[in-house]
Amino acid sequence: MSLVIQPSLFGSLGELGVAQLGAAVERRPLSDGAWIDLRPGFITAADELFDVLAASVPWHEERMRMYDTTVRVPRLLAGYTQAETLPHPVLDEARCALSAHYAAELGEPFVSVGLCLYRDGSDSVAWHGDRIARESTGDTMVAIVSLGATRAFGLRPKSGGPGLRLQVGHGDLLVMGGSCQRTWLHGVPKVASCLGARISIQFRPHWGDQLRTSTAGGPDGKAQ
């Protein structure tokens, strides 16, 4: 698969790896007990990881039911359960680092890994709140690592009111926690022009087998 990666001043410098979390993580409280954490540059020298994932992951297209017709999901998808080997050891390092950092709050490790490939600006994901790995009244965390082109990541409260739009770049980490999946919606909108492809890597706790049927955005959730 031939894809264009957005040029990055830092993505090809240094050694591919996982940066420290700790004090480098910025928490932004939202309403209704929701919050997001941001850690720019969590994956260092990320160009290599983008290239490996784009070429080696078994990407597939899915379709979903919308009213009385079936439509193409506007992005390519892949998923790995706890029992499956991840496509690059840096993903194992990232999962371990996230599990250690959020152990006290989450109470369990991150397990499943979902991936989305946004081939260009016409690929997107609609407003939604994830149902994967949470109950109707329970909370969970979703940790998202972005590779490739910088894309807008929008969040807005379900109850109405102002939201926010973040520009998430190459190697950046965004974590949604607290009540975020119940009380807020998030999405990646289409853009008229885009400098390249984007890969989103989502780390979630338990229920990894659900990934097989829910990454397309069915009743159990969507992937970012």
What positions do the PLM features span?
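Non-heme Fe(II) oxygenase metal-center motifs and adjacent flexible, charged/small-residue loops
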Residues: 1-224
